[in-house]
């Protein structure tokens, strides 16, 4: 599994973000789209891991604003690379069950 299993709109969104910020290290699809339990109400959960990030909250706000250009079902989650590990409960779940896109 990988990029080919990711909704096209999510790929376009990630490509757009990568052009704006080349400091993206990795991206993951997680949640219902990753585990195959998609419903009509499912959002598209994306973990976006940055090499360095001064403020995850500010980046989270920016990512949420930028998603409006694509689809409000996209649910981006910003992480610093240094925080994206098994000691972070959400990151741990993503590492175990998510699909690495880039």
Regions found by a protein language model. Give the residues of each.
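Conserved H-loop
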Residues: 32
């Amino acid at each position: 599994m990988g990029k080919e299993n990711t909704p096209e709109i999510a790929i376009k969104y990630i490509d757009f973000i990568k052009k704006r910020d080349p400091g993206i290290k990795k991206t993951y699809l997680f949640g219902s789209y990753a585990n195959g339990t998609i419903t009509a109400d499912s959002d598209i959960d994306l973990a976006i891991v940055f090499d360095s990030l001064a403020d995850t909250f500010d980046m989270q706000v920016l990512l949420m604003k930028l998603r409006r250009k694509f689809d409000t079902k996209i649910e981006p989650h910003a992480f610093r690379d240094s925080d994206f590990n098994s000691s972070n409960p959400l990151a741990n779940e993503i590492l175990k069950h998510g699909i690495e896109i880039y």
